[in-house]
Amino acid sequence: MLLDGGILSTSVLGQRVAGVDEVGRGPLAGPVIAGAVILDPECPISGVKDSKQLTAPARERLAALIQAQAVAWALGRAEAAEIDQFNILQASLLAMERAISALSVVPDLVLVDGKHCPPTVCPVRAIVKGDQQIMAIGAASIVAKVARDAEMIAFEESYPGYGFGIHKGYPTRAHLAALKALGPCSIHRRSFRPVRRFLEA
């Protein structure tokens, strides 16, 4: 389904189409998480769009609807250590691959947001700005964003003082100040330049 209300049927010619997107490429800490969603063409979900265009309450409401009504949905992740090991692009593709593999229904076609396709046994196509065009990709971005935000909020208790629940690991002024005062913790991405700078100081 297209987000403008037109149809790129979620079952193109009877095929099961999975939308895939990741969140968390830009933060200095925490995992990158990918969502994979196969929507039910008989149950369109109003309001689905790129997760960045939604408020947190709207994302949470839509994530619950997506999880309840989708044919299948799943999450995949790559940890900070894997991001440091492989680089953020390869870690993002790994998270996508894991999300696709975790689906309870095998898709006939996978549509991925962006320019790069993850390795998968299914036919896959990358669509630039797909999260703004394809409903299943928008849905994937929503479930991934809600899951990652919840995890970063939970890290507040494990790693007090960094403000992860507020900035979600992104390089805000407050986060950089906390890094300077406390140094990196175990979920920081040591290969990212701002974190590496504090490690080398």
Swiss-Prot record:
Q: What does this protein do?
A: Endonuclease that specifically degrades the RNA of RNA-DNA hybrids.
Name all RNase H type-2 domain ranges: 15-201
Could you list the residue ranges forming a coiled coil in this record? none
Q: Please share the entry's free-text remark on the cofactor.
A: Manganese or magnesium. Binds 1 divalent metal ion per monomer in the absence of substrate. May bind a second metal ion after substrate binding.
One GO BP annotation is: DNA replication, removal of RNA primer
Q: Which cofactor does it need?
A: Mn(2+); Mg(2+)
Q: What is this protein called?
A: Ribonuclease HII
Instruction: Please tell me the species this chain comes from.
Output: Nitrosococcus oceani (strain ATCC 19707 / BCRC 17464 / JCM 30415 / NCIMB 11848 / C-107)
- EC number(s) on record? 3.1.26.4
Instruction: Provide the alphabetized UniProt keywords.
Output: Cytoplasm, Endonuclease, Hydrolase, Manganese, Metal-binding, Nuclease
Q: Which family does it belong to?
A: Belongs to the RNase HII family.
Report if keyword Acyltransferase is assigned: no
**Which gene name belongs to this protein?**
rnhB
Which GO cellular component terms, listed alphabetically, does the Swiss-Prot or TrEMBL entry include? cytoplasm; ribonuclease H2 complex
Q: Which Pfam families match?
A: RNase_HII
Family annotation (PROSITE patterns): RNASE_H_2
Subcellular location as annotated: Cytoplasm
Q: Which GO terms describe its molecular function?
A: manganese ion binding; RNA binding; RNA-DNA hybrid ribonuclease activity
Please name the top-level EC class of this enzyme.
hydrolase
**SUPFAM superfamilies (alphabetical):** Ribonuclease H-like
Q: InterPro entries from the entry? A: RNase_HII (IPR022898), RNase_HII/HIII (IPR001352), RNase_HII/HIII_dom (IPR024567), RNaseH-like_sf (IPR012337), RNaseH_sf (IPR036397)
Catalytic activity reported: Endonucleolytic cleavage to 5'-phosphomonoester
Binding residues for a divalent metal cation: 21-22, 113
